[in-house]
Regions:
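Hydrophobic alpha-helical transmembrane segments
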Residues: 35-47, 52, 93-96, 135-147, 190, 193-201, 245-260, ...
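Juxtamembrane inter-helical linkers in multi-pass membrane proteins
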Residues: 72-88, 123-124, 164-182, 216-237, ...
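Hydrophobic alpha-helical membrane-insertion segments
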Residues: 2-3, 96-104, 141-163, 247-269
Length: 301
């Protein structure tokens, strides 16, 4: 379904004047003979920019299949036919509907669905790349964690398609020799906000390890400090506990907001480069920040 939303573009033909010029040069003529012809699929639609279309295509494909099954619009085979073969014939009807429908829109009518959706979501993408939006996202993540719900899995799953679009633009800018300008991407939160995991609990693990007065606190600190270095802090969140604990929830929510503001100002002042790639989230903070910002040592500091 997704590939059918992409309008193929034709490869420009070599003009007669270029052909005449190339005939006088054997190497140039050989090069022109090797050039492809026909149509190609634009590669930019296969990247992060096409993620929204991919999500919509999945919904459309599933709904068409469900509709044909509920309404009985399918090829029914005799009972003697093996179930696997019968299911293959049943899926032919929705497949034909999808191919004809999407081909009519893209191939025959020439409607660029990617361009339309890109225009519609552009205000949302621009709004996400702001400090207030980033603070709201962080607050929502911490809010869900406060009740023991994995905030990153819920909020980040919704914001990730937009983050990837912004990150892709940063990567393209650096590849073209320009400066990346989008600050509000996922690696920004990962390496400058969630230090030691959601809520920046690495400092809390160190505090428990060396300053806790109770035996339980010291044991918890020694147990969680190593995982926290690699951004795994569920033992601290549920062991302290931070969940449903007002005394720890306040810094758990406020500290990431403060860190985000400081890091945003530093990046906006070009003290640190914008993130241009995704580094594995289990890396220690300085290493991950260094890699995500394209080898900028200031990010590690």
């Amino acid at each position: 379904t997704f590939l059918l939303t992409i309008v193929p573009v034709s490869i420009p033909d070599v003009t007669d004047s270029i052909t005449a010029l190339a005939s006088k040069n054997a190497e140039l003529n050989a090069f022109l003979q090797q050039l492809p012809s026909g149509y190609v699929i634009p590669a930019e639609n296969l990247g992060s920019a096409g993620m929204f279309i991919g999500i919509l295509s999945a919904f459309i494909g599933v709904e068409i299949y469900r509709f044909t099954q509920v309404k009985g619009i399918k090829i029914t085979m005799p009972a003697a036919v093996p179930p696997a073969v019968a299911r293959s014939f049943e899926s032919l009807t929705p497949t034909i509907i999808i191919i004809l429908g999407m081909s009519t829109i893209t191939m025959w009518l020439g409607i660029d669905v990617h361009s339309i959706v890109g225009t519609l979501i552009k205000p949302l993408v621009n709004a996400t790349d702001t400090l207030p939006s980033t603070l709201i996202i962080i607050f929502l993540i911490m809010f869900f964690w406060s009740f023991g719900i994995h905030g990153d899995s819920i909020v980040s799953s919704l914001a990730r398609p937009i983050w990837l679009i912004l990150l892709d633009q940063n990567t393209a800018a650096v590849a073209a020799g320009k400066v990346a300008t989008h600050i509000g991407v996922e690696p920004f939160l990962q390496w400058f906000v969630h230090i030691g995991g959601s809520g920046a609990t690495l400092g809390l693990a160190i505090l428990f390890c060396f300053k806790a007065k109770s035996k339980y606190g010291k044991t918890l600190g020694r147990t969680t400090i190593l995982p926290s270095i690699f951004n795994i802090n569920e033992p601290m969140i549920f062991g302290a506990p931070i969940v449903l604990n007002p005394m720890l929830l306040i810094p758990f929510i406020v500290i990431p907001l403060v860190l985000a503001t400081i890091a945003w100002v530093a990046t906006a002042m070009h003290l640190v480069n914008c993130a241009v790639t995704i580094a594995p989230w289990t890396l220690p903070g300085p290493i991950g920040a260094y890699l995500a910002c394209g080898g900028d040592w200031r990010a590690a500091v």
